[in-house]
Amino acid sequence: MKVKKMRPPFKTHGGKYYLSSWIIENFPENHEQYDYIEPFMGGGSVFLNKTPSIGLKVINDVDLGTIQVFRALRDEPKTFISKLKRKKYSENVFKRELKKTEFKDYLDHAINEFVLRRMSRGGLKTAFAWSERLRGGEPGDLHAWKTIVQQLPEIGRAHV
């Protein structure tokens, strides 16, 4: 039985979603017995789709916002997801988050990062993305937003 690959919470430039199976196939035998260090996390496609390690798991990325999203999913998933569910997929929400330069705490930073990455074209956090193409009877980008927010609990449990 083929296991469905888990999508990362957001797209990143150079993301490894399509390569993740190949990368994982080339891990050493019994890799789950060892510590796992991910120095360039990005969207986390490899991390989310590999067999969980029983040892230490360390993720890192030069983009602090990326780490804050995974931290929120690990430490406060219910609060994080609840706040995201209240965010409407709209250009106004995107622009408001784009203007933010200071955050109350890491959770506020994580929400900002998630909104900017999921509501922008290609996850680049620069321009709002909107598609007239329909998916599930609604615009594609709106459908993708609702779908990923529903999948966040599973992503959060992936390697906790």
Give short role names for the model-derived ranges.
Residues E32-E91:
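Conserved S-adenosyl-L-methionine
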Residues K2-H31, R74-H159:
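SAM-dependent nucleic-acid methyltransferase catalytic core
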